[in-house]
UniProtKB/Swiss-Prot annotation:
Family: Belongs to the eukaryotic release factor 1 family. Pelota subfamily. Highly divergent.
Membrane-crossing residue ranges in chain numbering: none
Lineage of origin: Eukaryota, Fungi, Dikarya, Ascomycota, Saccharomycotina
InterPro entries, sorted: eRF1_3, Ribosomal_eL30-like_sf, Transl-rel_pelota
Protein name: Putative pelota-like protein YCL001W-B
UniProt record, GO biological process: nuclear-transcribed mRNA catabolic process, no-go decay; nuclear-transcribed mRNA catabolic process, non-stop decay; RNA surveillance
Length: 84
């Protein structure tokens, strides 16, 4: 998480935040590590939930590391509320 926040603050194009940006990175097979919150996997909108599951599958198929983060963690709450 610290590496992600560091790259995000440097704006060095090594970290993406948000669904659209992350999907673009996935299309380029540019995801080495995927951090995703458990809340997106619990959405009532089945199409959106399936989209995130596809993103996880794509990242895993390209040897990416996948971490599902609990939204109950304070750092995840801060990240979710961050204005970027």
């Amino acid at each position: 998480m610290d590496d992600f926040l560091e790259h995000l603050s440097k704006d060095d194009n090594k970290a993406w935040y948000g669904a659209e940006e992350t999907e673009r990175a996935a299309k380029l097979d540019a995801i080495e590590t995927l951090l995703i919150t458990d809340s997106v996997l619990k959405r009532n909108d089945v199409k959106k939930r399936e989209k995130y599951l596809d993103l996880i599958e794509n990242s895993g198929n390209n040897n990416g590391k996948i971490f599902v983060l609990s939204t109950s963690k304070i750092t995840v709450s801060n990240l979710t509320n961050q204005q970027i």
